[in-house]
Amino acid sequence: GAWRFPGAWPDANFNLAHLKTLIRKLEAAKFDAFFMADHMAVLNMPMAALKRSHTVTSFEPFTLLSALSQVTAHIGLIATASTTFDAPYHIARRFASLDHISNGRAGWNIVTTSNPDAALNFGHDEQMDHDERYRRAREFYEVVTGLWDSFADDAFVRDVESGVYFDPARMHTLGHKDEYLSVRGPLNIARPVQGWLLSGLAGDGAGGRVRLRPPARRGSGGSDFHGRQSLARRAALLRRHQGPRGQGARAGRR
């Protein structure tokens, strides 16, 4: 792997000092964002290959990006988070916290986790099938964005004289109950700086087209991450994704 190249840092993905230097250079070079992949299990590959892979150890994304936010000011910080092996309340809190800590620079790479070994790490005997994972992902995203809308932007008045910290009329309880998830709310964190965060997903399968509604503030929106493809293929994917996203757009709670 690349960790063996002459002059490379063998522990580059697990060395905080190196990552701080790297992200400062990326920001100075005007990169838009720092994207951090994540895995919910050690990758399923033959041991002969695995023993040569740097992927067996890496930082948890939210912890690392929170640290990197303190040595940068402008670059976006995109964390990978699974909708299959986590709870939407946890995810909503983590991203809201990261967005406040970074002053509105957080982003969410949505994944459904295809590695079957991940299921064994979270109390399941087998992986949820592909289509079901994406149905859950759609509902999961709706819950997370709903939780981000728990408080209006002006809810926290913090009036010292009256002793009123927030306006109850500006708080919204989600009360979600559907096929996969039951979440009452509200979130116990103020609305993210961006309102709804920049969110995106990888892949181009029919099941993977999760409808992403654009956030309400700062011009953030949805993104789709794809591998190397022909120009015609990319154009077709763009047309396919733009339709559902445009139809599903709405403003967030204000």
Roles of regions detected by a PLM:
Residues 3-8, 48-50, 76-81, 218-228:
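Glycine- and acidic
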Residues 19-29, 95-99, 238, 242-248:
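Short amphipathic alpha-helices and their capping/turn segments at secondary-structure boundaries
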Residues 27-28, 65-73, 99-105, 246-252:
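Acidic (Asp/Glu)-rich catalytic clusters
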Residues 34-36, 75-81, 104-110, 197-202, ...:
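Hydrophobic faces of well-ordered beta-strands that scaffold small-molecule active sites
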Residues 57-64, 68, 75-88, 128-131:
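Aromatic/His-enriched, Gly/Pro-containing loop or helix-boundary segments
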